[in-house]
A protein has these predicted regions:
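Single, function-defining residue in the core of a domain
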Residues: 1-46, 55, 65, 86-88, ...
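Short secondary-structure capping/turn segments at boundaries of alpha-helices and beta-strands
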Residues: 36-40, 58-59, 96-97, 110-113
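Short alpha-helical "recognition helix" segments of helix-turn-helix
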Residues: 52
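Short, basic interhelical loop/turn and adjoining N-cap
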Residues: 56-71
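Active-site-proximal, Lys/Arg-enriched surface segment
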Residues: 69-137
Length: 296
């Protein structure tokens, strides 16, 4: 009985054919090396050039490991290779073929910062698919103190990019934690025609109509009435001194002293359910990070 074995060259050819479709103008030198780097990285579960080189077979096994390692390093430091442009081609191809199986057309988009000790910071926007988080857009910064990683303009650029990936048939719902309390960020998402569900810090000021005093009073969002076992919803709340209008959902606080307080431009009744979906995507991405990107 004959048994067919796929070699590294077979896999590489398959990746090359995909890249030719997704990136018609890819350089030949990149087309020849990228598939093998991808295979080596997967096999080694590492992006360290030496680890990748040790896993490569076929023609690479005829070359000393040091030489293969140097070739991989040259690729990573080559100014003609832009990883952001490369990933842009890949993700646009993927999203163009993406179809939702359920009728509501909701797509949950999560943005967050990831840190690797003191080595680097990544601002990443991901799409939740099942129990996985698929990166759509990201920017990397050295160490964990680079202020560029936290600038509003960077976040707005990433959100605008993600918006451009999807046609109007999809309902994009952006989810963010307490790092992202900017009303300008909310306004930007709203201007693109999408929904935001952002968790608020409890010390943010709001202007709330007090029924007893029969006028608006200034208080922190954490001081808004809430219930232990039921969600509470507020519509048309003025947020911060800019008095930006949002809807607010406060989850049941149960045994915790800090319940979820979600600002949304959508239905507050749906906001908590949507925000809960942030965790499946984020946890997956964090596991990816802690396992060198190879958690599946």
């Amino acid at each position: 009985m004959n048994k067919v074995y796929n070699t590294q060259n077979d896999f590489a050819r398959g990746i090359q054919e995909f890249l030719k479709i997704a990136m018609p103008n890819i350089r030949k030198t990149q087309l020849n090396i990228i598939p093998f780097i991808m295979l080596g990285a997967i096999l080694a579960e590492s992006f360290v050039p030496l680890d990748i080189a040790k896993k490569l077979k076929g023609d690479f096994s005829l070359v000393q490991v040091d030489s293969v390692t140097k070739r991989i390093k040259r690729f990573f430091t080559n100014k003609l290779f832009d990883p952001y442009v490369f990933y842009d081609h890949i993700i646009r191809f993927v999203i163009n073929t993406y179809k939702k199986k359920h009728p509501d057309k909701d797509v949950h988009i999560v943005f967050d910062h990831m840190f690797s000790h003191d080595h680097f910071t990544v601002f990443m926007i991901t799409m939740r698919i099942g129990k996985q988080g698929i990166p759509l857009w990201f920017r990397c910064f050295k160490d964990n103190n680079d202020t560029e990683a936290f600038k509003l303009k960077l976040m707005q650029d990433g959100i605008s990019y993600v918006s451009s990936l999807f046609d109007k048939d999809f309902n994009l719902i952006f989810l963010g934690d307490r790092w992202f309390n900017s009303t300008k960020l909310m306004e930007h998402i709203d201007s693109l025609g999408h929904t935001y569900n952002l968790r608020l810090k409890s010390n943010i000021n709001v202007y709330h109509h007090d029924k007893k005093e029969n006028h608006k009073i200034r208080k922190t969002v954490g001081q808004l009435p809430k219930k232990k076992y039921h969600s509470v919803y507020y519509k048309n709340i003025e947020l911060t001194d800019s008095k930006y209008i949002v809807n607010i959902a406060i989850a049941p606080y149960g045994e915790t002293s800090e319940p979820w307080i979600i600002a949304t431009n959508g239905d507050p009744d749906k906001a908590i359910r949507d925000y809960n979906k942030r965790f499946g995507a984020v946890e997956c991405v964090f596991k990816n990070q802690k396992s060198n990107g190879f958690y599946i």
